């Protein structure tokens, strides 16, 4: 795969920023979560909690998450969503994110489109459409870190280094929502419902995740 000059420049810039962080950041403070994610609301708008999933101890150790939830929500029209929130006290020190592309559904699902989309409350998040045969899923994700809502992996890394240097902080969270488009349903309407859910999630997560 051929890399564009822009992408090469970004990667080199990230290396330079990382080097600067290592040179000038003497200490990075681990930032505890405000309150356990287990208290995350079980009702968000029209969506009601259905069940929760858990990682095995080895997976938790591998990820280095300080806290996480994986909740399924359903609504009256048969819609289904999975909300995953992971929190790290010091990304790259106590644990860290995997590439969001690795967190997308596998098992024969193929990426159909990727784009940044705005939220009505402000800010942008990533929207990915994946498909398998006649089925489609919508994946929304973003980084909610130190008071910012970030869609781009590159900008997340840049802010991570800058905040390590100037604030001695590397705490952050990765949030992902997966929804199954109902067969025969209105995909655009369903996506809008997911975006509304995401906007509410941003505001609710701020009650748990440390801000700026």
Where are these regions (language model features)?
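A short, solvent-exposed beta-edge/loop patch
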Residues: 4-19, 23-26, 116-212
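Alpha-helical transmembrane signal-anchor/signal-peptide segments
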Residues: 27-44
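Generic detector of ordered secondary-structure context
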Residues: 39-40, 65, 167, 193
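A generic secondary-structure signal marking the coil-to-beta-strand transition
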Residues: 45, 79, 171-173
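Short, solvent-exposed recognition patches
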Residues: 48-51, 56-165
